[in-house]
Each structure stands twice: as C-alpha cells, then as structure tokens.
Design a protein with these regions (language model features):
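Membrane-proximal interfacial segments on either side of biological membranes
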Residues: 1-48, 59-246, 255-312
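Short acidic-hydrophobic surface loop/beta-edge motif
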Residues: 52-54, 150-152, 250
C-alpha cells in the first residue's frame, strides 16, 4: 500500500506460510491465523499451524503476538509453543528423533525479543543414555538459548543439566550431573550392580559428526557376579554409538581391579584387559593369570572361600 496505514481484520484458514529471518527459514503448513492489524496502533495476532520445517522441524506451532506500531522499535509481547520438535533438525545430536515441546513468552523490540520458557520431553534416547521425563527452563535472547535446571530420570537415577545453544551456528555445550544411576541398565548385565554418580560434558561445534561427550564417574559399593566391591571410579568418552570407559578402578577387599578400557558398543559390553593390583605392594597381575596361582595378596580360590563364609 505504498506506505499507507493499515487497519484491517485478518482471517486465514488452512493456509501455507514461509518465513525468513537472518539464516533462519521456516515453511509452515495448515496455517490458521486471525487477528487485527493496525499500523497506527496496537496489533494482535493468533496463529496455529500444522507441521513445519526448515531451520527447525516439528508438529505444530501456536502463538499469540501483540505489536505496538506507535513506537519505532515495535515493542511486542509474544507467547509461543512449538510441539513435536525434532532435536536432530536443530543440530542437537545425530539421528535423534524423540520429540520435544518448547514453550516461551517474552517481550521487547520485535527484532530482539527476550523470552523465558520451558523445554519438555517424555523421553530422549541418545547413544548409551536413555532419559525420561525431561523438563527444564530456557532463556532466549537474539538466537542464543540457555538451558538451566533441566532434570530427567536416567537408569533409575536423576540427571540435572545446564547448557547453551545458538540457533544460527548450532554450536552447543551441555553440562551434566547424575546421581543414583543403576549400572545394570546400561551394561545389560544383571550380575554387575552399583549406583553411579557422574559428571559429564557434551560439546558440538555445529557439526553433529564432531559431537563429543566425556566426564568422570564414581559409585557406591556393589557386586559383580558373586564378588562384592567398595566402589568404582573412572572416566568415560562417548562418540556416536560407542561409550568408552578408561582408567577404571574397582576397590575390593582383596585388592584393586583395574582396566584401562572397556566399551559399550550398540548396547553390548566389551571388556579389555583386567588386572588385580595389590593395595600394599602395587603388584599387578591379570585376572586370567591369577585364577590358578597366587595373585597380589591372595589367590582367587581363597577369595571365593571368603565370599562363601560371608554368605553363610
């Protein structure tokens, strides 16, 4: 209208819409829109959509927006809910299709909205980790998102997380702390039980193939087969579908069981060389060699007898 003011009521049923801003693009189907546009006053719009794609892929968006055209900066008040968002479409992980819901509301100039909201997911499955009932807080400021107080159930325990994510570069960093994780679930080994505490980090430079996770862990007392232990310590590294553990030490009554590496690949446990280390002398011997001869401190047969005595 060549700069002329608008004062109209608008209604759209089952439409299609394309939106572009900076490096972001969105293609939206089944659009229903109604509201009032007044370029000399306050405009309000309500929009509800079906599936959308582009920079982010999901099942639907519902939004309310109020824009004040009386001021040059176009101060706005918005509330948005995006349902069924696929994490992989945002660069969050490789081939992750568990769906999340993002809800946010905020205000500010239309070109620089600052919003607060929540993220929720019924479940999230990533290589070697299964999260349930994910819920946390988000803060959005000009393409930068921060996550805080995110909680989820993982392997019978609780994991809390915080992090940051950039919509345009898709660079993100996530910091995790977990407590009470049941070792039997990820290893799929009922004979190996303890409750694990872990601290970890996940980093991505924008290319999901470069995603890396690492951290350290410790555990309460537990048992492997019939052998009890006081606790486990070690570090881990996760890339793609392989979860690697390094410098793992198991503290037992008869010595320290140590391995430089064992791996969980596609859900299967692969053990490396395991050594039995005497706490006093530091002498090490492989478990295989210790089976039929004196190992560090004791022979394996004596260990078994000790276990039987404790049980009886």
């Amino acid at each position: 209208r060549e700069g002329k003011p608008l004062d109209v009521t608008i209604t759209v049923h089952n439409g299609r819409m394309a939106a572009f801003y900076r490096q972001r693009r969105y293609l939206v189907s089944r659009v229903s829109l109604n509201g009032h546009i007044d370029t000399r006053g306050v405009s309000d719009l309500h929009i509800k959509t079906g599936e959308f794609g582009g920079t982010m892929v999901g099942n639907g968006i519902e939004a309310d927006c109020e824009i004040d055209f009386k001021e040059k900066s176009l101060p706005s008040i918005v509330s948005v809910t995006a349902k069924g968002v696929i994490p992989s479409s945002m660069g969050l992980g490789d081939d992750i299709h568990d769906k999340m819901t993002l809800t946010a509301s905020g205000r500010g100039p239309l070109s620089h909205l600052i919003c607060e909201g929540t993220v929720t997911m019924p479940e999230l499955h990533v290589p070697a980790l299964d999260f349930y009932d994910v819920k946390g807080d988000i803060h959005y400021d000009d393409g930068a998102m921060t996550f805080s107080d995110v909680k989820a159930r993982v392997y019978g325990g609780i994991v809390t997380a915080r992090g940051d994510y950039n919509v345009d570069s898709r660079v993100y960093n996530i910091y995790l702390h977990g407590e009470g994780l049941d070792s039997r679930i990820p290893t799929k080994e009922p004979r190996f039980y303890c409750l694990v505490t872990l601290d970890g980090e996940i980093h991505c430079d924008g290319n999901v193939k470069d995603l890396v996770a690492f951290g350290s862990f410790s555990s309460s007392g537990g048992f492997y087969s019939l052998i009890p232990f006081r606790g486990i310590t070690g570090t881990f590294h996760n890339r793609y579908r392989a979860l690697d553990f390094y410098d793992v030490t198991i503290d037992t009554d008869f010595g320290l069981i140590h391995t430089d590496a064992f791996h969980i690949i596609d859900g299967k446990l692969h053990l490396g060389k395991i050594e039995l280390v005497d706490k006093e002398s530091g002498e090490a011997m492989s478990i295989t060699d210790a089976r039929n001869q004196k190992g560090p401190g004791r022979v394996i047969s004596q260990i078994r007898e000790d276990i039987k005595e404790r049980v009886s």
